[in-house]
Amino acid sequence: MLLENQVETDVLVIGGGIAGCFAAIKAKEQGLDVTIVDKAYAGKSGASIGACRSWMVYNPEWGVDFNECMNAFNTEGEYINHREWDEIILNESLAIYHDLVSWGVKFPPD
């Protein structure tokens, strides 16, 4: 039996993992109507459930060299990462970390 459900939305997010949920929240903060579509329950399927202990945040005030962080990031990704994307991710990681903390996300200590 084919089921069809038409939904009008400003933003359609495919995938309810960490990135999808984050994108949906940020779009909703802009006053947009958001719909998330996932194969299971948001946050309960896909790669995000295994990534909960693999966060890397870059803060230049911590005195850590950016290139050291990039090298660690590439090592964790077994050198199959796209370096330009990694650079964007690290440069935006602190702001994203602060957003998540402000939403009540608890991070494990170092």
Give residue spans per PLM region.
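A short, basic/flexible loop-to-alpha-helix module at the beginning of a structural domain
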Residues: M1-E8
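Generic alpha-helix initiation/capping and coil-helix boundary signal
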Residues: L2, G16-G20, D86
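Generic secretory/membrane-interface signal
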Residues: E4, L32-D33, G104
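N-terminal Rossmann-like FAD-binding beta1-loop-alpha1 element of flavoenzymes
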Residues: D10-I36
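Conserved N-terminal/central alpha/beta ligand/cofactor-binding core
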Residues: K39-D110
